[in-house]
Amino acid sequence: RYIGAGAVAAGGIISLIKSLPLICRTFAEAMKGIFNKEKIGKEERTNRDLNIGVVLGMLAILIILIAALPVIPIGILGAVIIVIFGFFFATVSSRMVGLVGSSNNPVSGMTIATLLFATVILKATGTTGITGMVGAISIGGIICIVAAIAGDASQDLKTGFIVGATPKKQQLGEIIGVVASAAAIGFVLYLLNEAWGYGTEKIPAAQATMMKMLVEGIMNAELPWALILVGVFIAIVVEILGIPVLPFAVSYTHLRAHETSLH
């Protein structure tokens, strides 16, 4: 499992590194587009967005809730990490998906990078133990959702632009859709956990298990680095052979988890 975790982590970082030139270019272009918005026909119906004040207000409310809710023990520091990583990765994700497609969205790499940074930062600031682990996984999970939804919204808005839709109405629809689906998905995940439990033979949850192992290992300084490095080198060899690293690594981790549950 630790070999698989090392391979998944390396695969995520490799995909992120390979995407860096496009990430930097798209981030710069996106920022340029924001600041030049006043010059490109703001009054046109097909260029009408939600009021930026409303967007910032909703964002502020969400950040305060995330920082204050006891079930998400991340505090102000965790909220700041989410704002920084979320802003950058949402911009990158939406732009890359809009230009190339969802297959080019390195969500796994972004999630793993956030998870590692968040765990190290929380540990360095004294937030350790179960609280630190839950906080780090919460931050990584939120950023994963941010990157995925940003890419999805980008595809929707791009399609809307092609057919002449109004962005503001689409954005309102996106908000309604996200809230409704979050409630439904949360309820389903709760039922699955109550029925079978994650990490069992029925629901191995390989990626979640890998995230747990990495966070626990960093927090407790108990990572078996020899096995992790074996996984890293396997990922590098697989990349050199031209095989997609992340699908290979996740499949390996899932297989090992399944074998362990059978034994």
Spans of features found by a protein language model:
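Membrane-embedded translocation segments of transport machinery
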Residues: 66-154, 162
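Hydrophobic core segments of alpha-helical transmembrane domains in multi-pass membrane transport
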Residues: 4-18, 55-68, 82-90, 115-121, ...
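Conserved small/polar residues in nucleotide/adenosyl-binding loops
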Residues: 253-263
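Extracellular/periplasmic helix-exit of transmembrane alpha-helices
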Residues: 19, 104-107, 124-134, 184-205
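Membrane-interface alpha-helices at helix entry/exit sites of multi-pass transporters
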Residues: 165-176
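Juxtamembrane inter-helical linkers in multi-pass membrane proteins
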Residues: 26-43, 202-209
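Cytosolic juxtamembrane amphipathic/interface segments immediately preceding
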Residues: 34-50, 162, 214
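Short amphipathic alpha-helical coupling elements at transmembrane boundaries
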Residues: 25, 29-32, 98, 155-162
